[in-house]
Amino acid sequence: MERTFLMIKPDAVQRNLIGEVISRIERKGLKLVGGKLMQVPMELAETHYGEHQGKPFYNDLISFITSAPVFAMVVEGEDAVNVSRHIIGSTNPSEASPGSIRGDLGLTVGRNIIHGSDSLESAEREINLWFNENEITSYASPRDAWLYE
């Protein structure tokens, strides 16, 4: 089963949308196997967004992601990266499909509710960056028989 990293950003946490976002993810058949509400340390933010260092928006991005708690999570399911990317929607909420998390709940590119890994490689890197092994669990769910052939 594939795993991916998702992070509900400070704007969604402050708007009390954690439950709404998780519910949408679970309704699509993905299973939450790790999660934590946390204040992001500066060093973690800089490492996570290191690829954007030197870009004009980098400092604002780091300030935003460390400004309030986030809900970091690991979800599991068949084709989890692609399924979660589809549920999340386009980076720019005004271009995101209705029914997607960003299309329905996002306000601007900078306040777009959620981060999701964009590849299996990114998912593995981000999961290892944000979680220790003992913070992720595996479990069987009766619904699995109804979700997967």
Swiss-Prot record:
Active site, UniProt feature: H115 (pros-phosphohistidine intermediate)
SMART domains: NDK
Name of the molecule in the record: Nucleoside diphosphate kinase
Family note: Belongs to the NDK family.
Positions bound to ATP: K9, F57, R85, T91, R102, N112
Assigned keywords, A-Z: ATP-binding, Cytoplasm, Kinase, Magnesium, Metal-binding, Nucleotide metabolism, Nucleotide-binding, Phosphoprotein, Transferase
Assembly behavior: Homotetramer.
Any single GO CC term annotated in Swiss-Prot or TrEMBL for this entry: cytoplasm
Role noted for this protein: Major role in the synthesis of nucleoside triphosphates other than ATP. The ATP gamma phosphate is transferred to the NDP beta phosphate via a ping-pong mechanism, using a phosphorylated active-site intermediate.
GO molecular-function terms, A-Z: ATP binding; metal ion binding; nucleoside diphosphate kinase activity
EC number: 2.7.4.6
InterPro entries membership: NDK-like_dom, NDK-like_dom_sf, Nucleoside_diP_kinase, Nucleoside_diP_kinase_AS
Principal localisation: cytoplasm
Enzyme class, spelled out: transferase
GO biological process, one term: GTP biosynthetic process
Cofactor(s) demanded: Mg(2+)
Reactions performed catalytically: a 2'-deoxyribonucleoside 5'-diphosphate + ATP = a 2'-deoxyribonucleoside 5'-triphosphate + ADP; a ribonucleoside 5'-diphosphate + ATP = a ribonucleoside 5'-triphosphate + ADP
